């Protein structure tokens, strides 16, 4: 269905809602450099000569390819930005001829999904996974927002419970959403004087500390992290500075590896608001089949 982004689930994101359907309007909030919007460039069409930021619309891969060829006709553009679909066209546009086939490594068949996203698309994926056998744990407001919780006695007890869950079920979910909505967490944050940014950072940091405690657990298998904040805080909390992309397992779902305390681990990452309903099930099946 066609829907402008400001009216989509991305428009009601509590942390970073998309308020504009036009990229030029979004750019205008962040810079005084003039931005201009143009339709797709066709074969042989001249590139507009305006000074500033030129935004080209596209409704298909063919549109992206057509605009890309027009932009590259007279040499490589100095500076570009675009979506992942456009990035996939760059090797041909830049005449990068080398092709390598990457084989997905054998992964631990046990899968832990850690979700810090509030996007409705992801929540539906979690529901479908739970309905098909995933164990699902929702962190409490205290677990998400109390600094030092995972070092406390209650935190240590909770970690023992998580390890037991991981050992008992090869497919598990740990998420930060309250059942039926996130009002309990919002109330808990308000009582402690946390604004929206404090709430966001606090939750992501708590997930990072929790995973830091789990990284050495023999019950932990392959990790799947949803949401950029979740990934960033997890890496920061355990001191990991570098992720090496390995391959794309599905569209927009990337397998990467990192080294932690001399041990190589794999992590699957995806955007919170991305993917079809059965994505988690299909990924779990694919890992188990390798």
Please describe what each predicted stretch is:
Residues 162-226:
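C-terminal structural cap/anchor segments
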Residues 44-47, 66-71, 101, 154-166, ...:
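A short, acidic, amphipathic alpha-helical segment used as a generic capping/interface helix at domain edges
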Residues 76-148:
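Acidic, glycine-rich loop-and-beta core segments that form the ion-binding/anion-interacting portion
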Residues 220-279:
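Conserved, well-ordered active-site substructure
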Residues 10-12, 16, 22-96:
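Functional cores that coordinate and move charged inorganic groups
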Residues 51-55, 77-79, 110-112, 169-173, ...:
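Residue-level preference for the first positions of well-ordered beta-strands
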Residues 2-4:
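Short, small-residue-biased leader/transition segments that mark boundaries at the very start
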Residues 56-61, 83-85, 115-118, 176-178, ...:
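Structural motif
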